[in-house]
From Swiss-Prot:
NCBIfam families: cinA_nterm, molyb_syn, PncC_domain, PRK00549.1. It comes from Bacillus velezensis (strain DSM 23117 / BGSC 10A6 / LMG 26770 / FZB42) (Bacillus amyloliquefaciens subsp. plantarum). PANTHER family: NICOTINAMIDE-NUCLEOTIDE AMIDOHYDROLASE PNCC (PTHR13939), NMN AMIDOHYDROLASE-LIKE PROTEIN YFAY (PTHR13939:SF0). Belongs to the CinA family. It holds the Pfam family CinA. SUPFAM superfamilies: CinA-like (SSF142433), Molybdenum cofactor biosynthesis proteins (SSF53218). The lineage of its organism: Bacteria, Bacillati, Bacillota, Bacilli, Bacillales. This is Putative competence-damage inducible protein. It comes from the Bacteria. InterPro entries: CinA, CinA-like_C, CinA_C, CinA_KH, Competence-induced_CinA, MoaB/Mog-like_dom_sf, MoaB/Mog_dom.
Amino acid sequence: MEIAKKAEIIAVGSELLLGQIANTNAQFISKELAEIGVNVFYHTAVGDNPERLKQVIRIAEERSDLIIFSGGLGPTKDDLTKETIANTLGRPLVLNDEAFRSIEEYFAKTKRTMSPNNRKQALVIEGSDVLANHFGMAPGMLAEHGSRLYMLLPGPPSELRPMFENEAKPLLLKKLGSNEKIVSTVLRFFGIGESQLEADLEDIIDAQTNPTIAPLAADGEVTLRLTAKHADEKETERLLKETEAAILERVGEFFYGYDDTSLVKELSKACRQNGITISSAESFTGGLFSEWVTDLSGASQLFAGGVVCYSDSVKQHVLGVKAETLAESGAVSKECAKELAAGVRKLTGSDIGISFTGVAGPDPQEGHAPGRVFIGISAEGKEEVHEFNFAGSRTGIRKRAAKYGCHLILKMLDQK
């Protein structure tokens, strides 16, 4: 089939039109399609109404040769996407045995009774390629009709994303007749803003052809997605490594990992590799740092314990902060952060103690504006306190502080 040059994404679900959820699926699919040279020209959202969906399909067929639908594949009466598309294409829905077995196994495993309407989820458009759903029950499908491709994907992002990456994208490339190997890698950076990163890499980004470079900033981090394509897979890898090396030569000090990793995952890995234990004293972060660390498997190997020390009494009587420190410098201070880190390290017997004290907002505290944060680190022969002024919501400030905590310990371990 000739490569599709015009793609359209149709998100189905009244909850989108009511503003109850954001259409993050369209953003994800557009980014993935751009990497394989397919241009998305239209995003459409339509409610759970078959007549309006038919109208949207007719419009899409006039201007697009790849039409991707997300949502409406569930078991309820308002999940009408595949029924409407099957009717439009003049094809029946047939039971997919593999999908039905998967649904039966799910209910047997969870010891729940399967409802008759769950069978509906195993129905697929006759003649379509079935996209397995390893994270849910409703399979996706890719149907070819005339000069167009119709792709149906589930609505939940936790199901749609792996299905697209592992099932739909490879099949789509095959359908489009591309023999190029497309490989992507994501470089993750922390401690540098998107504008500064792009300024440092301006000439490299401006000159991009193959690989392409796509920057993205989110939650205080910056990522660069590098995507290379070539008929020879080894050449694709070489192109990626060459560009990665040029990037890291300039901003390598802010780089911390690849692809789907995170700061806390890298921290956990580094601590376990070095046989280091850590502990935390958290005031305004309220246990967020310790929650992140203990969410990961193997946390008992590295996390000695944590104290949520919101009150001055706990700071003083549990962690040993001096009364005069609290009286003279206050709880939100460099001095308090230093004593908290040392206190929790001593209390738990860990190799490294980290503390978080600050103002999450929205109101000021002790004369400090929201976003004023002190992070203390205590290790054998080394004590340091870092001061920050963050902006954003209460939740955003707390998350930013916890991320910087991971970052600072990683930097300390790198220096050993």
